[in-house]
Amino acid sequence: MSKLKLNPYFGEYGGMYVPQILVPALKQLETAFVEAQEDDDFKAEFTDLLKNYAGRPTALTLTRNLSPNPMVKIYLKREDLLHGGAHKTNQVLGQALLAKRMGKKEIIAETGAGQHGVATALACALLGLKCKVYMGAKDVARQSPNVFRMRLMGAEVIPVTSGSATLKDACNEAMRDWSGSYEKAHYLLGTAAGPHPFPTIVREFQRIIGEETKKQMLEREGRLPDAVIACVGGGSNAIGMFADFIDEPSVELIGVEPAGKGIDTPMHGAPLKHGKTGIFFGMKAPLMQDSEGQIEESYSISAGLDFPSVGPQHAHLNATGRARYESATDDEALEAFQQLARCEGIIPALESAHAIAYAVKMARECTKETILVVNLSGRGDKDIFTVSDILNGKEV
């Protein structure tokens, strides 16, 4: 059996905990990725798609009215302006190109909020690949606009009714499908989690977020920000923002997990701060589990953060202290969702609203000149019906 070319671990986290039948597929994927990263033609095609199809670089917007503190500037990295409406498009284009390079004809994906599903559907339509998306039945119900978008672009959307009928279960079904079809299909995983080499692949295809932010900050302010802030579910938008700043010790890295109804309740999705290490979804990582080691259901108002585990690099950054991880409740995210709309005329995704909420809270407590950058990971079109129902007093 050939050796791995990349380190599958981040400290103690990560690995490749999958059925033996999938090991050759993952090794083939790793080899293809390493070769593609060294291929100038592949890199040129990926860069061209990001620029001329997806619309990069995205803007870095200085908010005019959001900061509650005159000493604090809050910038937004505008991934909401990317084609598809969220950061997901970056790495999906990369993986879809990689799948074509490997000769795959079909794409299997999972989705929570539907943003990864939409991004996968658009990439498959563009590149002529068959597309199958697994989505928890609960998420199908609460994200109907994205379900329609996926189907409009030719994707087959498969509702998953097992378990909690959310992202965790969609991930399991997608992995199960891939186990029987990997010779012709590529599993296009949507976050920086799962078995090696997915966390590394997703990070590398998302790191453009932080690279652009660093360049734009130096142009605008002549210095790096004091902190970069991003919401964390599986963790792809956050690792995309963090990656280029990890070796910049002056820049604080802050991830914001969903506290749901409250960290002191069972209704949250914060495994980094309140989970225990376990094996899930092909990786060793912090995991929400009960005293018997069974996976507990996560909860968040935002479907894209409703995940009981987290990517292994985030676990490592937390363990080493290089990044810190905070949380924001549903109520705080809802308030930030409305605040950004009213203050700046920008409607954020509920996922991104968690990061906005923490940034405003942090700004309030700053006692010196400070620059914060929030990764506005997606736009809020998909969430307006959910938020409208809540504000009108309906149960969601």
Swiss-Prot record:
EC code(s) of this entry: 4.2.1.20
Role noted for this protein: The beta subunit is responsible for the synthesis of L-tryptophan from indole and L-serine.
GO cellular component, one term: cytoplasm
GO molecular function: tryptophan synthase activity
Catalyzed reactions per annotation: (1S,2R)-1-C-(indol-3-yl)glycerol 3-phosphate + L-serine = D-glyceraldehyde 3-phosphate + L-tryptophan + H2O
Pathway(s) of this molecule: Amino-acid biosynthesis; L-tryptophan biosynthesis; L-tryptophan from chorismate: step 5/5
PROSITE patterns associated with the record: TRP_SYNTHASE_BETA (PS00168)
Family per similarity comment: Belongs to the TrpB family.
CDD domains on file: Trp-synth_B (cd06446)
Matching SUPFAM superfamilies: Tryptophan synthase beta subunit-like PLP-dependent enzymes (SSF53686)
Taxon lineage: Bacteria, Pseudomonadati, Pseudomonadota, Gammaproteobacteria, Alteromonadales
Keywords: Amino-acid biosynthesis, Aromatic amino acid biosynthesis, Lyase, Pyridoxal phosphate, Tryptophan biosynthesis
Quaternary data: Tetramer of two alpha and two beta chains.
Coiled coil: none
UniProt name for this protein: Tryptophan synthase beta chain
Enzyme class: lyase
Residue numbers carrying N6-(pyridoxal phosphate)lysine: 88
Organism: Shewanella baltica (strain OS185)
Superkingdom as given in the UniProt entry: Bacteria
Encoding gene, per UniProt annotation: trpB
